[in-house]
Amino acid sequence: MTLPAPGAALPDDGYVAYLKAECPTCQLVAPLLGELGATVVVQDEPGAFDGAIDDTALALSFAADVEAVPTLVRRAGGAEVGRTFGWSRADWRRLTGRHTLGADLPELRAGCGSKTREPNVYEHLVARFGAPGFSSRAIAVGDWDDPVEACFDRGWTDGLPVVPPTDARILRMLDGTARRPGEVIGRMPPDLAPLTVEKVAINAVMAGCRPEYMPVLLAAIEAALKPVFTLHGVICTTCFSSPVIIVNGPIARRIGMNSGINALGQGNRANATIGRALNLIIRNVGGGRPGELDRSTIGGPGKYTFCFAENEADPRWQPLAEARGIAAGRSAVTLFQGDGIQGFIDWKSRTPQDLSRSLAMSLLAVGHPKLCEFFNAVLVLSPEHHAIFADAGWDRARIEASLRDNLRRPGRDLVAGAHGVGEGMPADRGDAMVDKFWPEGLLVVRAGGAAGLYSAICCGWTGGRFREESQPVTIEIAE
């Protein structure tokens, strides 16, 4: 249906009333409309009011920006000169100049919401009848074409189907942030293309995000674009790496992120789609496509999505974001340059000392047992493993210090050629005691289900060897 020209079905002079049959206040004022000679526009059941204009397509109500019914509009010379909504005897008398109008009606009666403002409706009306105002180029899809296949054909997907980014869906996604659609967040590597909030929303739609995920996604993007995150290198490396998003704070619970059972796996919409949206933006805006500027030799599943929330349920545990300088109780994201998951199983350690030594044995294998101060890593402690530490009174600082001590080894065992293995540290480190990670290079996170003595290790990118140039990034989420 095409939107009628403003006022095309309406009188140049007189009154227009916008009603819903299901609204009791509309039924209350209906007898007055004949007295006023008003043109009646009905959003739901035109037959409920004699001579009413059928506006079930909501074109007239949208054009008049009706937010509540009944709305009474006074027109003169083809233009609106006044309006009121709901029923207020004083307001209706003031608008009409009829000082005895509605004398037998209650003084006040609240109206009802306009159908134009029902969930998901307004965005569709803007897309259909209005001007969305997007700067991105519109792509027309034929009536007989499959829009999902059209996205595949244009190379917009990560290999899985995406949600077609219609105008209504994009508008709805933009409702998830107060930031202007045209705001440029930064230049997305590797092509360094300008990334606007609008383009973020488009890719968030395709990834399957809900609007309330936008603050997390925008913060993750801002963290990834910090120079010290070296996103260009992470995208273009021959290594396995991709951005890993770790979310802390109230927003993770509010949007339903998973920090418990299967936290690093499938099945949670927020976890899956926030990480996927970032990777789609890298691909669709930045040009980071496999075989082009993405040169990963083997790749990794994190190139689809790798996003989870930290389990903050145990008050004995200091959340990662707080440990990295964010005020307690605030929401934040940490971006890490990570590979896949290396499983850690220890069913038998019962003391924090034993468990620390056991964890260190697995952490030594990150990247290569003889490469040190070369990778960062994330250690995801399951609640049962964390409880072994916490029940003994160990806090984050003590856990990290013990791991650091257990990860320090003689350089003679690590230099190239030692133990018949060519890989290793430079010969000049042979007389030193060498740490596996930089002091700030091991991020310890608590996540996972309540049952199971299983934790996980996520190896970092090889760029971590450049300590000052490539680091994880934590920023607060603007809510």
Where are these regions (language model features)?
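Short active-site neighborhood of thiol/selenol oxidoreductases, capturing the structured segment around
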Residues: 9-33, 39
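Thiol-based oxidoreductase modules, predominantly thioredoxin-like and allied folds used
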Residues: 37-58
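Structural motif
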Residues: 18-22, 42-46, 382-384
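Non-catalytic, surface beta->alpha helical segment in thiol-disulfide oxidoreductase systems
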Residues: 67-68, 73-111
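Long, low-complexity intrinsically disordered regions
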Residues: 104-129
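Catalytic cores of nucleotide-enabled group-transfer and carboxylate-activating enzymes in metabolic
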Residues: 4, 13, 36-37, 72, ...
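Non-transmembrane, aqueous-exposed alpha-helical and coiled segments at domain scale
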Residues: 126-479
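N-terminal leader/targeting and pre-domain segments
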Residues: 1-13, 99, 103-112
